[in-house]
Amino acid sequence: MTTKNNKQLKSVLFMFLLLIGAYVKAQEKNVSGTVTSSEDGMMLPGVNIIVKGTASGTTSDFDGNYNIEVPDSNAILQFNYLGFVTQEIKVGAQTNISVVLQVDQNELEEIVVIGYGTVKKSDVSGSVSSVKSAELTAYPTVSAEQALQGRAAGVQVQSNNGGEPGAPIKVRIRGGTSINASSDALIVVDGFVGASMPAPQDIASMEVLKDASATAIYGSRGANGVIMVTTKKGTSSKPTLELNTSYSLQHVNNTIDLLDADEFATYRQAYSENYVQGPANTDWQDEIYTTGSISNTQLAFSGGSDNSKYYISGNYFAQDGVVINSNLERFTILSNVDVDITKRFKVGLNVFGGRSTKDGVSTQAQTGGTGGGDVISSAYRFAPDLGIYNADGTYTINSLGDDIDNPYALATESVDERKADTYRANFYAAYEFIDGLEFKTTFGFSSENTQIGKFKPTTILAGAGVGGEATFEYRNTTNTLSENYLTYNKSFGAHNLSLLGGYSYQKVQNEGAFAGARSFVTNEVSYRNLEGGAVTMQPSSYLNETELVSVFGRVNYEYASKYIFTFTARRDGSSNFSKNNKYAFFPSGAIAWNMAKENFLKDSNTITTWKWRASYGATGNPSISPYETLAKFSSVYAVVGDQQVNGVVLTDFANDNLKWETSKQLDLGLDVALFDNRLELSFDYYTIKTEDLLFPRPLPEYSGVSSQIQNIGELENKGYEFSINSRNITNQDFTWSTAFNFSRNKNKMVKLPDGDDLFIDSAPGHFLQRQTQILREGEAIGSFYGYEYKGVYQGGNFPEGTATLSGDSDPGGELFADLDGNGEISTADRKIIGDPTPDFTMGFNNDLRYKNFDMNLFFQASVGGEILNYTLLELGSGAANSTADMVNAWSPTNTNTDVPRPAVREKRITSRYVYDGSYVRLKNLSFGYNLPESFLGKTGLQTVRLYVSGQNLLTFTDYPGADPEANYRNDNNQRSNTNIGLDYGSYPNVRTFTMGLNMKF
């Protein structure tokens, strides 16, 4: 990767030098100056300065300075900035023109993107949080989803596997609204529903739509909230080139303190006297962890004229992970072109393309038996008194207790390669028939092709038993979207009316194929020569389609900036459902009252906005598989005599009554702005009740089918959110702004099939598969379920209400609560032992600027919420290495301890391994410096910013695991909703140090 990165850097520098030469030209007349605000005297960065009547222009730098060439003294400079009155000045004989822009009270307000349109922030009647480009790029992140963490109240962002390069990231808004369907937020990029996120540097703004009033316009897909992403566009100015590049070093945030070789030998000999200590003393975590790195470079070219605008951006991202042999390389390109054909006719095209290549390592995988484990869990458990190699050069294998693969061999010998190509194009045309009445049509298409190749050689346990195993998988998803809608906006005195009506058609097609082989004569073939395997694995393939047709509408009415009414409705029809429930209707309504505009407050010097909001509506979740309503059959065969007879067997009954899960949400909110918007506060209280949850209902054995998916459950989310944004200090040399958000969400099951408890297994196919969690009416989703640990048994009679498990009744064993009082511990003694849902989450951001220096300080916190640490449970089982606290284990001479005696124990779910997952983390600390205009001189550069930053620098927590943000990877919807708060063998989280450069010319 180093050579490749060097080549990339050289290429970028070469382009940079060429472009500097291209833009240096003869000057007819040069004008410079400073642009400031009339309100507070602050310098205004990013002001558009255009030579009127031409495409020539520039923008003011971070300190409000600008420099522009004009053809002659008759030229007129036009100064344009959002929220301020446009000003025009004739150049004449002047060479220095400093401008004070006046605040435009009519345009000052922030514009918020909502479904199929935009509104002024003051006219929003629903619950919407906005995240701007500067916040998303305040520090380097691997994805835009990660940059969203802690930035908006009510939004939970979590990696599917710690700091793994390319790990999927889940975004949840106001908790999970489903059990067996998806609870992930819907992502809409430039109007394309279901698009993948662009790079953070290409995003202009991001709006999080949270309540039903805001999300009902997306109907059956809006139950989990909507994230509206708007990418950057060109401006009517001279061409501008931006280069943003950074290089990061990454280190493992935290390791687990384990027994060394001598301690391990003493530990094993305590219950296995014949154990002979090995010859080595290996720190296996040190063997698989390394210093990671990230190289991230973006080059963006933008500009335009009065009639056309363009923005073209390319991004190169390369990451070497902190686990050896794990990396990711990604290229993306984004293009936005907007053209005004006439005053009333506009067209535009958005194109996105990307390729990613990922080399992964096995994590959170099956352990024990022939599975052998994964890289992370094996590093924790592998005997420390063994080295990497045997005397004959082969890899060592842990064969005492659980069979465990050599973690170094797993990381370096196994192959897990993924290549994904993503393309998206979205075209629009808009025609304004009369003032305020516009028709817009869009057509978009996206395709994502993924290839996954894996090889398990004979040098690891999973491959040794089958002579090596190679698999290859192909997946393709295409998404076609066509939308047509009319908008009408009209003002009648103090009355403002906005109407929207439209039609949408979307088709998603998924196809894929799988092939594999075993028993290879050599490990050199990998997965690209499947015919080299003597044994062919069962191949498979699939093809499915989903079509969604919709009509939608919205009415916004606002009177005198005081009273706001919104009604939204959408009717969806999906091919996934049968004729009985093919269509569903999702309405919502909202009202808002800006009390600050009333006569008794409008002259207040303190209160700028005091807006009460209320909304109620219904949204849906259509996440059932295509053909789920149909009867299903599987092929079978039998041998009759000497002939094979083929046939089919019924595996699922048809269900014509399946329908959407529906979430009904009430939201009550208050938005306050004080002191000319210097202090902004927002509060929301909400309840979300999801009905018709999809659950498998058990069927009688005589039916021949084990269960059937039916709509028979209900759950509820309740919570509140609070956010503050303040400009604490604003003067010419120093500014300080603060943003704080606070969220609390609690959920519970309201209704289950027949009222019965449902036990949730974790880690399917894993030797750790256990009933870890429970769904019970009135209790939190995913509550941990197991035995209540009561300490170490000291001998004699059991303390009242306690007992030991069978086979562990000697002194030093584990004591548990005997709930049924029969003197024995059985499954009847299990209870709810923890709730994985945090009590509340917080984000606290500070931006400071002094002259040319800037600093960002960002904290993120989660308080409450337990974690079941599978890793520590496994390490405490006695079947492999253990944690360092085992040196303080119970013994006849060390009875004053809470660590049980060394022994091989069954891996049971107990409260001993349930921990408080609270933490406060310094998510980012960055320092930047903008080179002054006087230094840049005649270079052609507008701005140059140098910065250094650190992420995850400090973490305050009592959690004993590797990281409190750990999350067990779940690849299906059910377990991603219920197997929350599990920590097992996750790819480690990282601490990152970055140096970066931003240039604009």
UniProtKB/Swiss-Prot annotation:
The keyword DNA-binding does not apply. InterPro entries: CarboxyPept-like_regulatory, Plug_dom, Plug_dom_sf, TonB-dep_OMP_SusC/RagA, TonB-dep_OMP_SusC/RagA_CS, TonB-dep_rcpt-like, TonB-dep_rcpt_b-brl, TonB_rcpt_b-brl_sf. It is a multi-pass membrane protein. Residues 120-232 form the TBDR plug domain. A motif (TonB box) lies at residues 109-116. Residues 1-26 form the signal peptide. Pfam families: CarbopepD_reg_2, Plug, TonB_dep_Rec_b-barrel. A motif (TonB C-terminal box) lies at residues 984-1001. Induction: By ulvan and rhamnose. Residues 238-1001 form the TBDR beta-barrel domain. Its main location: membrane. Keywords: Cell outer membrane, Membrane, Receptor, Signal, TonB box, Transmembrane, Transmembrane beta strand, Transport. It is found in: Cell outer membrane. GO terms for cellular component: cell outer membrane. TonB-dependent receptor probably involved in ulvan degradation. Ulvan is the main polysaccharide component of the Ulvales (green seaweed) cell wall. It is composed of disaccharide building blocks comprising 3-sulfated rhamnose (Rha3S) linked to D-glucuronic acid (GlcA), L-iduronic acid (IduA), or D-xylose (Xyl). The TonB-dependent receptor may mediate transport of ulvan oligosaccharides from the surface of the outer membrane to the periplasm for subsequent degradation. Belongs to the TonB-dependent receptor family. This is TonB-dependent receptor P3. It comes from Formosa agariphila (strain DSM 15362 / KCTC 12365 / LMG 23005 / KMM 3901 / M-2Alg 35-1). The lineage of its organism: Bacteria, Pseudomonadati, Bacteroidota, Flavobacteriia, Flavobacteriales.
